[in-house]
């Protein structure tokens, strides 16, 4: 499942965040890549312990944990602290699959990367190229969203970032360990939950709603891992 979640941040908030990112000191993005990925990765990255990364990352997670669409689709158990990158001057990241497990807090905790997310802090007209290209069931999907918007997709997906030939592309990316490991099961639960919400709005007193809601929770109980 590939899902576009709009307006995590407002235009005014994005403008302030991007201004701060533009003034930050960036490092070589290869530092956080695995052995194979490092050979394909050509970008800049904000150090993970940078105060700005922590500040914006905490604000992002607070928004997302209170966002009904993200919660419904991701069913998050744990989230890897958001990272921040910049592509400019031909920077790119060739096709790769993210590492299956990420260490957090110096290895004291681990996060399984069931879902990948990218939150854009540059508008499409601010740069040329830089599309996030994701290979899914329906072929190659090119993603280039407005600043403040997020795309959520399975961590198992082969993906790349096309070269940025003009301007700069600022974004954040992170991984989520879901209560439900399998993408097909998460997709089914998401579709059920969205249907339940629509029916609750349109026919709130329909007796089948209780049964359908019960079925959703029984499936979640069967498939969830804690």
Curated annotation (Swiss-Prot):
One of its GO terms (molecular function) is 2-oxoglutarate-dependent dioxygenase activity. It comes from Pseudomonas aeruginosa (strain ATCC 15692 / DSM 22644 / CIP 104116 / JCM 14847 / LMG 12228 / 1C / PRS 101 / PAO1). One of its GO terms (biological process) is intracellular iron ion homeostasis. InterPro entries: Oxoglu/Fe-dep_dioxygenase_dom, PKHD_C, PKHD_hydroxylase, Pro_4_hyd_alph, Pro_4_hyd_alph_FE2OG_OXY. It comes from the Bacteria. The keyword Metal-binding applies. Residues 78-178 form the Fe2OG dioxygenase domain. Gene3D superfamilies: q2cbj1_9rhob like domain, Rabenosyn, Rab binding domain. This is PKHD-type hydroxylase PiuC. Binds 1 Fe(2+) ion per subunit.
């Amino acid at each position: 499942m590939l899902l576009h979640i709009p307006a995590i941040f407002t235009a005014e908030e994005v403008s302030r965040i991007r201004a701060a990112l533009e003034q930050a000191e960036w490092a070589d993005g290869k530092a956080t890549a695995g052995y194979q990925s490092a050979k394909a990765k050509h970008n800049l990255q904000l150090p993970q312990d940078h105060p700005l990364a922590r500040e914006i990352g905490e604000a992002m997670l607070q928004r997302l944990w209170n966002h009904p669409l993200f919660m419904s689709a991701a069913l998050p158990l744990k989230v890897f602290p958001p990272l921040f990158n910049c592509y400019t001057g031909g920077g790119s990241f060739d096709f790769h699959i993210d590492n299956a497990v990420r260490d957090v807090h110096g290895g004291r905790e681990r996060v399984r990367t069931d879902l990948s997310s990218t939150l854009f802090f540059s508008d499409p007209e601010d740069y040329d190229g830089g599309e996030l290209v994701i290979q899914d069931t329906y072929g190659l999907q090119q993603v280039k969203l407005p600043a403040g918007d997020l795309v959520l997709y399975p961590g198992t997906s082969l993906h790349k970032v096309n070269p940025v030939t003009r301007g700069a592309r600022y974004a954040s990316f992170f991984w989520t360990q879901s209560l439900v490991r399998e993408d097909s099961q998460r997709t089914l639960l998401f579709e059920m939950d969205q249907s339940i919400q629509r029916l609750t709005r349109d026919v709130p007193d329909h007796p089948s709603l209780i049964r359908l809601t019960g079925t959703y929770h029984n499936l979640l109980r069967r498939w969830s891992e804690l």
